[in-house]
Amino acid sequence: LKLREDLFWFSIADSDIWFWARAIAAERGLDVKISEPDVSPLAVQGPKAGAVVSSIFGDWVHDLKYFWFAESEINGIPVAVQRSGWSKQGGFEIYLRDGSKGDQLWELIMAAGAPHGLKPGHTSSIRRIEGGMLSYHADADIDTNPFELGFDRLVNLDMDAEFIGKAALRKIKQEGPMR
């Protein structure tokens, strides 16, 4: 998420991107601070997610593009609301910005979701797989490249900009993936 011109959040889940970002910053001599924010994500997923989340924050949430977000506040609870999720049905992730208000946010969401049948749950692998979303370590890891995943359409090796791994990806494209 790009919160400001000079502030980005990466949702790292169980990946090594935090270490990667630190290594890039050190190797390039960048004047940046890389830290893990005190933020707690809460996902509202499924066919009624939009109704639940809009009943809390308002209809503007329907205008969010997929993977876009907006900062908001509800009952004094600071959050970032993102249109995203691990299901084909879509949903939202609400990033709590003040951990001391976690219980309040939980109760607020559960109350708003009650008329819609909202229940606590967990990530569902089949929903993720049906939605075509990969999970780091389960489906891919640091040794997996986009060509092995069938993501050729997402790789533009003709662009003028240089990026880390461009030469390696050119070689893989030319020789074909090993697996």
What are these regions (language model features)?
Residues 2-179:
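Conserved, structured C-terminal
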